[in-house]
Amino acid sequence: MEEQPRERSEAGAEACEEKRGLSQAAEERIEDRISLLLRLRAQTKQQLLEYKSMIDTNEEKTPEQIMQEKQIEVKIEELENEIEDVKSNIEMKSLALSRMKLSVALRDNMENMGPENCVLTDDMKHILKLQKLIMKSQEESSELEKKLLDVRKKRLQLKQASRSKLLEIQIEKNKQKEDVDKMENSEMIKTMKKKLQTEIKITTVVQHTFQGLILASKTNWAEDPALRETVLQLEKDLNTL
């Protein structure tokens, strides 16, 4: 009879060692992933610093450069969120591993206890029950954190899409302005402006001539509505039209 508790204890210890080995391997994989993410974040930040130093040498940033800079910043933020998520998972798994070890130890002690220790046994059962509830709550919390991370990623994607759209609009406006400037500075537009100024000058001379003729005729043009309208039209400055 004494050999059975000992065998159970040894089996529990072996199971605990096996779980510990699997958990350690999982932790090593997660730590490798964190190291990779940290290296990627450092490389991305370095690229951003180099990019900014190159841009600072210019007097003004182009919309394309601003867009690339914002994309790098969004990528850094995504990496930081992913690192925080991995760290949180490691902490959760470490706590779960500790509780598994404690559960195995408590179970072994309960099997070795006699009837006289029933009160302590009940306490241990209650502790194990609480541990299961805690682990369940932590799993639910982990799921909520994953959902929160997904929401953050979607928010970043929307922010990036909004910035990209605004930059596209700005690029289009700048292009239209450049096209207008090119048209205004083109030889055809210059020639048309010269012709227009010549026509304005000729028309102004004609206006003054008609005004002189009307005044020289000593006609009371104010009493004639049609003539009054003509005189008022002749007084307009064509350069302001």
From Swiss-Prot:
Subcellular location: Nucleus; Chromosome, Centromere, Kinetochore
Lineage: superkingdom: Eukaryota
Modified-residue entries (N-acetylmethionine), positions: M1
GO BP terms: chromosome segregation; kinetochore assembly; kinetochore organization; mitotic cell cycle
GO molecular function terms noted in the UniProt entry: kinetochore binding
Pfam families, per the entry: CENP-H
Function: Component of the CENPA-NAC (nucleosome-associated) complex, a complex that plays a central role in assembly of kinetochore proteins, mitotic progression and chromosome segregation. The CENPA-NAC complex recruits the CENPA-CAD (nucleosome distal) complex and may be involved in incorporation of newly synthesized CENPA into centromeres. Required for chromosome congression and efficiently align the chromosomes on a metaphase plate.
Designated name of the protein: Centromere protein H
